[in-house]
Amino acid sequence: NNWVFDAPQTFSGFENLAALFGYPVQIFLDFSGYSDMSIGVAAILGFYLPDNFYFPYRSLSVTEFWHRWHISLSFWFRDYVYIPLGGNRKGKVRMYFNNFLTMLVAGLWHGSSWMFVIWGALHGFGLVVHKFFSRQLGISFPRTLAGNSLSWLITYLYICFAWSFFRAKDLGVLGKMCDKVANDFSIDYLVPFFHARPAWTLCIIGVMLSYLFTERQYHRLQARFILLPWVTKLLLFIICLQMVVEVSQESVQPFIYYQF
């Protein structure tokens, strides 16, 4: 993923597209992973820390996404930026403006780069559009399987689109990636890619299957795992460790959010 973003012109359109859709997964697993480790270490020491992520990529709107993603930071911006600006207490137009401005500030909080500003603006725009249609016009997707699926797909693609600005160094790099996807994309790359990277293929399949789990199914699976014999847990741990070794790079990769 990092290699593609560093030199997109040297990779195929398929690999560029895989990087664009892979980064949202990478940053979630990276950030959520070390948040979970912090929660676990704190629990060992007798302290309780609340969850910082709650199935963010199952969100059906940008508004819901920010109730599930980096919850501690979301609450901080709500309490110290959105509410002091007036929140939703000064009319609907002001509420939309406050939502948009809060997300702009969230973008700048990550760094003084136009790419972060654009990322924040996209999320602000997504919040405003969702609130306007759902609250002002009373328009929303029906709560059916088809409606939820379409709502999820639109939200997920929009979130991935916003993440591309967060990750790319500048608009030039992002433009090159989009150009490769548009002009050098072929499914003929799929078979060689999967044959050359079997461990990555298993990871990709695992991630895709994980999207099918509901919150209830996850908690049920978690409860069953806790009751497993220690030998079974050890075997599963060894399998996971082997997969990590297979896909890991030679150099140590720092956590993405450490820079923030």
Spans of features found by a protein language model:
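Membrane-embedded transmembrane alpha-helical bundles that form the catalytic cores
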Residues: 1-210, 214-259
